[in-house]
Curated annotation (Swiss-Prot):
GO terms for cellular component: cytosol. PANTHER family: GUANYLATE KINASE, GUANYLATE KINASE-RELATED. ATP binds at residues 13-20. Its EC number is 2.7.4.8. It comes from the Bacteria. This is Guanylate kinase. It holds the Pfam family Guanylate_kin. Disulfide bonds: none annotated. It catalyses: GMP + ATP = GDP + ADP. GO terms for molecular function: ATP binding; guanylate kinase activity.
Length: 207
């Protein structure tokens, strides 16, 4: 591990687009070296989810106390539930040279952009809104009213993709994973990220 500061990778998109599925695919890849920043939420745990692995599940009162203590990079209330990203883990991990991967809601990503303007923002988009609705129905975890609410929110969120650096369509999970990995690799090769290191090398060579 060199002294280059880690990159903050923000993956966001509408509810039901498959953010969690794509994230799991990325982290199941043995070549992945990112550190996953686990978000905190007050929503109910879904089947198969593990506290402290997929999310930190908290009561609403606990979450609101942490907000008062300014313990989040971002937080948002979405369809009646809070979601947030604990701040200290992210800063410490990046300072150690690791890339940190955030999987968050669109509203939360807007807050991260203000605090971490140099982060890498990737919008995960559905092939279509009809496809998104089918995914939500297929979950079998929410009422038709809740699904309609999420699809309505998704329309507004798709219109906000101009706030992101890249858009990846989740038409196939493996392809989405590969596209995201390629984007991160290219981001590390940007001149702005490596120029300072080479300037320092040149100055030291002149001594």
């Amino acid at each position: 591990m060199d002294n280059e500061k880690g990159l903050l990778i923000v993956l966001s998109g509408p509810s039901g687009v498959g953010k969690g599925t794509v994230r799991k695919k990325i982290f199941d890849d043995p070549s992945t070296s990112y550190k996953y920043s686990i978000s905190m939420t007050t929503r109910d745990k879904r089947q198969g989810e593990v506290d402290g692995v997929d999310y930190f599940f908290k009561a609403k009162s606990e979450f609101e106390e942490l907000i008062k203590q300014d313990q989040f990079i971002e937080y948002a209330e979405y369809v009646g539930n809070y979601y947030g990203t604990p701040v200290q883990y992210v800063k410490d991990t990046m300072d150690r040279g690791y890339d940190v991967f955030l999987e968050i809601e669109v509203e939360g990503a807007k807050q991260v952009r203000k605090k971490f303007p140099d982060a890498l923002f990737i919008f995960l988009a559905p092939p279509s809104l009809d496809h998104l609705r089918e995914r939500l129905v297929g979950r079998g975890t929410e009422s038709s009213e809740k699904i309609q609410s999420r699809v309505h929110e998704a329309r507004k969120e798709v219109e906000m993709m101009n706030l992101y650096d890249y858009v990846v369509v989740n038409d196939e999970v493996e392809l989405a994973k590969q596209r995201i990995q390629s984007i991160v690799e290219a981001e590390h090769l940007k001149r702005e990220r490596i120029e300072a290191k080479y300037r320092k090398m040149i100055l030291e060579a002149k001594k």
